[in-house]
From Swiss-Prot:
Gene3D superfamilies: Nucleoside phosphorylase domain (3.40.50.1580). CDD domains: MTAN. Homodimer. GO terms for molecular function: adenosylhomocysteine nucleosidase activity; methylthioadenosine nucleosidase activity. It catalyses: S-adenosyl-L-homocysteine + H2O = S-(5-deoxy-D-ribos-5-yl)-L-homocysteine + adenine; S-methyl-5'-thioadenosine + H2O = 5-(methylsulfanyl)-D-ribose + adenine; 5'-deoxyadenosine + H2O = 5-deoxy-D-ribose + adenine. Keywords: Amino-acid biosynthesis, Hydrolase, Methionine biosynthesis. Belongs to the PNP/UDP phosphorylase family. MtnN subfamily. The active site is at residues 12, 197. This is 5'-methylthioadenosine/S-adenosylhomocysteine nucleosidase. Pfam families: PNP_UDP_1. Catalyzes the irreversible cleavage of the glycosidic bond in both 5'-methylthioadenosine (MTA) and S-adenosylhomocysteine (SAH/AdoHcy) to adenine and the corresponding thioribose, 5'-methylthioribose and S-ribosylhomocysteine, respectively. Also cleaves 5'-deoxyadenosine, a toxic by-product of radical S-adenosylmethionine (SAM) enzymes, into 5-deoxyribose and adenine. Thus, is required for in vivo function of the radical SAM enzymes biotin synthase and lipoic acid synthase, that are inhibited by 5'-deoxyadenosine accumulation. It comes from the Bacteria. It comes from Enterobacter sp. (strain 638). Substrate binds at residues 78, 152, 173-174.
Amino acid sequence: MKIGIIGAMEEEVTLLRDKIENCQTLSLGGCEIYTGQLNGTDVALLKSGIGKVAAALGATLLLERCKPDVIINTGSAGGLAPSLKVGDIVVSDEARYHDADVTAFGYEYGQLPGCPAGFKADDNLIAAAESCIAELNLNAVRGLIVSGDAFINGSVGLAKIRHNFPNAIAVEMEATAIAHVCHNFSVPFVVVRAISDVADQQSHLSFDEFLAVAAKQSTIMVETLVQKLARG
């Protein structure tokens, strides 16, 4: 099995990259792909860049060049579920765009023409992630993760997301674009991220302060998940 892992920022991939044995780097289209073995398992780690276009471009390059069997999207996210705090884990059962609006033509809010309203994560990957969470004794929430090209740190943006997606557990800027590409390529995916802020008016400050905490937690989680998937 070859496992694809995608993070947007240097801080979100550096700890994993440092663990890759026989690491080789491919720079392409503004992205970097690191290939090798993580604890003996073939992996391809992508640093995509921030935002939906960068994530979609990177995910497409990763799938075309490296042919991974599954995709794990890792990194940080803003917490929306009331029980979440910095360092907690969120696992997607679905991903949706929070900034797409074609409702004038009868589509659901967040749905693009020709696409499902939401992109469902793979049940087996979700189950494996939840098993890892129990094994590591981490605080975690599973549910809807929403994505858009905005860092949410104000009451207006937050209120709009809560109105349109009252069940959303977290918000970030890449996951749904990655899920969209995986859907088009029929490759199973799951989003496993750690909370860096709680998407409020101080989130830009807490993000800077706690990004390292989120990166460490998500790295531990992803490394454990890779090992579990490799064992079957």
